Amino acid sequence: MTQTFADQKRKTVETAEFTEDGRYKRKVRSFVLRTGRLSEFQKNMMNDNWGTLGLDYQTEPFDFAKIYGNDNPVVLEIGFGMGKSLVDMAFANPDKNYLGIEVHTPGVGACIAYAVEKGGTNLRVICHDATEILRDSIADGALGGLQLFFPDPWHKAKHHKRRIVQPHFVAQVVQKLAGNGFIHMATDWENYAEQMLEVLSANTDLVNTSKNGDYIPRPDFRPLTKFEARGHRLGHGVWDLYFVKK
């Protein structure tokens, strides 16, 4: 049976940690590969539009000026889910370039479909482990900002080590940010918000924009996500953090 590009992309993500040279092998992962069904529509969207909207992992830094056709700042979003808020932000901010990373192929397919519907040329998506993209495919100082909205909270204490927001992750992101680049995080888990605040505040290259030294009100430019709406329904608060590189 012939595999389509979308099938191969899913296979690549699912087997990445088992390659013979060990390059993709990681002991602790911040995500779980969900096995949701990739619909025929999503598959077709990926197959038909990957050449214009998709980027593949590579071992040398992306040439963003060539990819986007301009020198506008690049905002990276990790874990965009189904991609609606990412596409909406890209459409609302044509003066910025957006790069989204998601390992869940149905989400990638849905994001591409919505991007095609909305139009615009300032969005690209990647279906790969974000830590490897940061490590190998993005040059130091190349990003205008990082967005991390409602990452997996790994709410059990024994799983907190799996949370993506750790000192080494933040240090890696800061290295990739240009001067005055931002890190914007949001979560509906108070314990995770506290960890985010602690880790971000401990990095001496970052400045908290909160007047109180903790969280900021939800900014108008961040679209309401389904995770945030779920949090409201469950009676959870939502915490936004916005730090800037010195």
UniProtKB/Swiss-Prot annotation:
Residues at which S-adenosyl-L-methionine binds: 77, 102, 129, 152
Xref: Pfam families: Methyltransf_4 (PF02390)
EC top class named in words: transferase
Enzyme Commission code(s) on record: 2.1.1.33
HAMAP family, A to Z: tRNA_methyltr_TrmB
Family of the protein in this entry: Belongs to the class I-like SAM-binding methyltransferase superfamily. TrmB family.
NCBIfam families with a match to the protein in the record: tRNA (guanosine(46)-N7)-methyltransferase TrmB
UniProt protein name: tRNA (guanine-N(7)-)-methyltransferase
